[in-house]
């Protein structure tokens, strides 16, 4: 028997089984032990292949692909620390719901814990973070092919959200010509090879059902909190809230158009808190709220009823409100809970929001970080999308901007790490093929610098704005010890990104005024490929501007 040949037959069944569950994108890192999986993926015409030399970035690339495609994305890596590098993306997927299928090649059992090279204990390496985990045996014809496909089908069929880790040991030899070894074993699956259906089909049901007392509650005074959702859902929610006459507090990821902009500013005003305290019901649609004042209000509000609707299962309310946790897609839930036309009840809130917006506009004239966040709408590409980084960037955009309703916005706001942001944005662009604007801070860019290699393959104009405020200025908003802040929190690196862009053959601009930024953006959207635009700003101006506006709005 040819071991290398049967390894490939076994791997071919694995990859083919995944196609029956909607896997179309496969992300592959170089490696020897993963050869059977890599060759099987390469030979399967159902797949779109993506490659990257860094497994951590590869995992985030897959995450971005899954965000847009709404389908599971497979990742193939070799054994050893290559596997561990997938951990950050896996954790994020578990919190935000994207489906990742991690195919990790492994040494066979006899090479574990005996000093063999590149051999670590891979089963269970991700602890409780995967939604599902499989540790396959080494390939053998003693195990029916039907067992292999049914095992994979069961795991994929029960995967509602998050990652599936499939550990795949392969013995050597890994290379050699493909011969007839294992053909009969594969053929026992019969006409499964010609079909497009799983061997074992699972029925899944996701629907909370209509709340029977909705017709009662929709006549009450309500508030809508909009968290992370799709662009289409964001437009629906905005119309639904308008019909009900309820104030809508929209997060930057809600894509609702934020009809009451600057919520994270005006919620610091006592008048707003007093007005909203009259609410009898709060309905939160989507999780992962960003703004600090929004989260503070969410945690302290005391309505008669608090409903939280999200397709993700589990507890998603860190304030632990008494109420209802409803598992459903937001679109389906809105369809089951129609709005009734009513007059707006919180009449002071729109005026506070308008005053906060006007004040922000008046004070965001100079060239800077907070000012860019306020103006970001004018730099969005037509028929495009926005990817927002973490730390200070997302907070400024959430607090100071007003994005178009239904305009696609993506981010990694599950674990909210600064690792893998550029890689994720690259995946978002590849899956959508749309023009893409991504904005991150300088430390985030440094953390994922080799992901600039992925941007060379952008299929539409891609603009990466790096806001260089020389360190982690988010800590300027926190009561960190002044004497230790720079050394242990901000950690300024005093770098510029011109040579990084050149190393990866990306176009580069460093504008120093609004007119120069306008010209750079206009040029970038007219050209194919990726452009890195670096905004060098005064270190703490963005954080200070936010604090200044908060103080002013609180006294309106």
UniProtKB/Swiss-Prot annotation:
Enzyme Commission numbers on file: 2.2.1.9
Pathways per UniProt: Quinol/quinone metabolism; 1,4-dihydroxy-2-naphthoate biosynthesis; 1,4-dihydroxy-2-naphthoate from chorismate: step 2/7; Quinol/quinone metabolism; menaquinone biosynthesis
Protein name listed in UniProt: 2-succinyl-5-enolpyruvyl-6-hydroxy-3-cyclohexene-1-carboxylate synthase
Organism: Enterobacter sp. (strain 638)
Cofactor remark: Binds 1 thiamine pyrophosphate per subunit.
Pfam families: TPP_enzyme_C, TPP_enzyme_M_2, TPP_enzyme_N
A Gene Ontology biological process term: menaquinone biosynthetic process
The protein's required cofactors: Mg(2+); Mn(2+); thiamine diphosphate
Database matches in SUPFAM superfamilies: Thiamin diphosphate-binding fold (THDP-binding)
Quaternary context: Homodimer.
Catalytic activity, reaction form: isochorismate + 2-oxoglutarate + H(+) = 5-enolpyruvoyl-6-hydroxy-2-succinyl-cyclohex-3-ene-1-carboxylate + CO2
Keyword vocabulary terms for this entry: Magnesium, Manganese, Menaquinone biosynthesis, Metal-binding, Thiamine pyrophosphate, Transferase
Role of this protein: Catalyzes the thiamine diphosphate-dependent decarboxylation of 2-oxoglutarate and the subsequent addition of the resulting succinic semialdehyde-thiamine pyrophosphate anion to isochorismate to yield 2-succinyl-5-enolpyruvyl-6-hydroxy-3-cyclohexene-1-carboxylate (SEPHCHC).
Family of the protein in this entry: Belongs to the TPP enzyme family. MenD subfamily.
Residues passing through the membrane, by range: none
GO terms, molecular function: 2-succinyl-5-enolpyruvyl-6-hydroxy-3-cyclohexene-1-carboxylic-acid synthase activity; magnesium ion binding; manganese ion binding; thiamine pyrophosphate binding
NCBIfam families in the record: menD
Superkingdom: Bacteria
CDD domains xref list: TPP_PYR_MenD (cd07037), TPP_SHCHC_synthase (cd02009)
């Amino acid at each position: 028997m040819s071991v290398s040949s049967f390894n490939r037959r076994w791997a071919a069944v694995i990859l083919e089984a995944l196609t029956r569950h909607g896997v179309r994108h496969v992300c592959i890192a170089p490696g020897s032990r993963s050869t059977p999986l890599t060759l099987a993926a390469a030979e399967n015409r159902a797949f779109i292949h993506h490659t990257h030399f860094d497994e951590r970035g590869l995992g985030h690339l897959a995450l971005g692909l899954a965000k847009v495609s709404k389908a599971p994305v497979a990742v193939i890596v070799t054994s050893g620390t290559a596997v561990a590098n997938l951990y950050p993306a896996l954790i994020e997927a578990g919190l935000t719901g994207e489906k990742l299928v991690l195919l990790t090649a492994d040494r066979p059992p006899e090479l574990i814990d005996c000093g063999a090279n590149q051999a670590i204990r891979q089963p269970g390496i991700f602890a409780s973070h995967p939604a599902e985990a499989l540790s396959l045996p080494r390939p053998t014809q003693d195990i029916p092919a039907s067992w292999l496909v049914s095992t994979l089908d069961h795991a994929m069929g029960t995967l509602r959200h998050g990652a599936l880790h499939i550990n795949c040991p392969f013995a050597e030899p890994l290379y050699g010509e493909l011969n007839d070894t294992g053909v009969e074993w594969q053929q026992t699956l019969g006409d499964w090879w010609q079909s497009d259906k799983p061997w074992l089909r699972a029925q899944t049901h996701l629907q909370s059902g209509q709340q029977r007392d909705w017709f009662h509650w929709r006549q009450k005074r309500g508030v809508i909190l909009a968290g992370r959702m799709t662009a289409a859902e964001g437009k629906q929610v905005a119309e639904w809230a308008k019909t009900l006459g309820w104030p809508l507090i929209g997060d930057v990821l809600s894509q609702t158009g934020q009809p009451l902009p600057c919520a994270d500013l005006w919620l610091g005003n006592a008048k707003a808190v007093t007005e909203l305290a009259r609410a009898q019901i709060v309905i939160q649609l989507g999780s992962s709220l960003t703004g600090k004042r929004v989260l503070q209000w969410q945690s302290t509000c005391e309505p008669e009823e608090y409903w939280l609707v999200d397709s993700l299962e589990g507890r998603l309310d860190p304030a632990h409100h008494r109420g209802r946790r409803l598992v459903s897609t937001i679109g389906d839930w809105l369809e089951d809970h129609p709005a009734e036309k009513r007059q707006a009840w919180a009449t002071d809130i729109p005026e506070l929001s308008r005053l906060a917006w006007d004040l922000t506009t008046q004070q965001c004239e100079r060239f800077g970080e907070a000012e860019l966040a306020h103006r970001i709408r004018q730099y969005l590409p037509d028929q495009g999308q926005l990817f927002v980084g973490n730390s200070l960037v997302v907070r400024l955009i959430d607090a100071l901007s007003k994005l178009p309703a239904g305009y696609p916005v993506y981010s990694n706001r599950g674990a909210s790490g600064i690792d893998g942001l550029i890689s994720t944005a690259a995946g978002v662009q590849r899956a959508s093929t749309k023009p893409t604007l991504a904005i991150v801070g300088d430390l985030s860019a440094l953390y994922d610098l080799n992901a600039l290699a992925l941007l060379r393959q952008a299929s539409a104009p891609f603009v990466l704005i790096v806001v260089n405020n020389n360190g982690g200025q988010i800590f300027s908003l926190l009561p960190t010890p002044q004497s230790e802040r720079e050394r242990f929190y901000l950690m300024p690196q005093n770098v510029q990104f011109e040579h990084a862009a050149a190393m990866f053959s990306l176009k580069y601009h460093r504008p120093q005024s609004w007119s120069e930024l306008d010209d750079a953006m206009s040029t970038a959207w007219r050209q194919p490929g990726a452009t890195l635009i670096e905004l060098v700003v005064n270190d703490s101006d963005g954080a200070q501007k936010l604090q200044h506006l908060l103080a002013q709005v609180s006294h309106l």
